[in-house]
Regions:
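Non-globular, low-confidence helical/coil segments that flank catalytic cores
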Residues: 1-265
Length: 265
């Protein structure tokens, strides 16, 4: 489920009884946690999470999760970027998780985690980069025949580094990129991410772009959306269109709208 969080990011993955949240924050929905995220989870009968992943610590990726942690929602494992260890916001998240009785792990490039039938591999992460967007976790999720790439707010510089690593035969970057069908577009479709070379490196069928309608940043960039259309990548945008459900059945993937955005007729 690609959540409609306004100007931010949020993805909920489910397989059987396994529930995983990847980011959940917004810069324009000040009560995202209580008004959107918590009601969404309750409507699906979710009272605990197996894993919550923070790609990086910007508020438009964590504000909803912060609320859940403050409410002491049970989260078995909180995953944070190793590059952010020692940063104030990551320390705050870790402390709240500890107080709620859960474990925290700082993820490194090459790490793998399994949850139910889902497997997650970190294929890129800058451990020495202080700038949050640049140390975003880049995760490839693998569920049966479905591969999704989650990119946080990585920029073109990081994409280039990732592609350089992928040129090495047998590398985890090459192994995973060549199978990615679905992309969670970096940085809300900003022109500072999603270079043509990066998009071309994957056999992409679809891309999700999460952003707030009429946002002041100009997201998504027309340059990015036009390039995706040029490469025959189907676009699924939250701004003005709401949340999207992605369902994997056998070898088929079904994507459909689920919730209308606020103010939409």
């Amino acid at each position: 489920l690609c959540l409609d969080v306004g100007q931010g990011d949020g993805f909920l993955l489910r397989s059987g009884t396994t529930n995983i949240l990847i980011d959940s924050g917004s810069s324009d929905q000040k009560k995202l946690g209580s008004r959107t995220l918590e009601p969404c989870l309750k409507s699906k009968g979710i009272s605990r999470l197996d894993i919550a992943v923070v790609s990086h610590g910007d508020s438009d990726h964590i504000s909803g999760l912060l609320y859940l942690l403050e409410q002491k929602m049970p989260i078995d494992l909180l995953i944070l970027p190793a590059g952010g260890k020692g940063g104030e916001i990551y320390g705050q998240l870790e402390q709240l998780q500890t107080e709620a009785g859960g474990k925290t792990y700082y993820m490194h490039q090459g790490d793998k985690i399994k949850a139910g039938e889902m497997e997650f591999t970190c294929i890129f992460e800058k451990e020495t980069e202080e700038e949050r967007n640049a140390h975003s976790l880049v995760l490839c999720s693998h569920y049966k025949d479905l591969h999704i790439l989650f990119t946080g707010d990585m920029g073109i510089s990081e994409e280039t580094e990732l592609l350089d690593l992928a040129e090495e035969n047998g590398s985890i970057q090459q192994e995973h990129l060549e199978h990615v069908q679905i992309l969670k577009t970096a940085h809300h479709g900003s022109k500072g991410s999603s270079s043509p070379a990066f998009l071309e490196a994957m056999p992409l069928k679809a891309a999700f772009i999460s952003y707030g309608k009429d946002n002041s940043y100009g997201h998504p960039s027309g340059q990015v959306t036009e390039e995706m259309k040029k490469q025959n990548i189907s676009l699924y945008e939250t701004g003005g269109k709401g949340a999207w459900t992605l369902e994997s059945k056998a070898r088929n993937v079904i994507i459909k709208r689920t919730v209308k955005s606020r103010g939409e007729n």
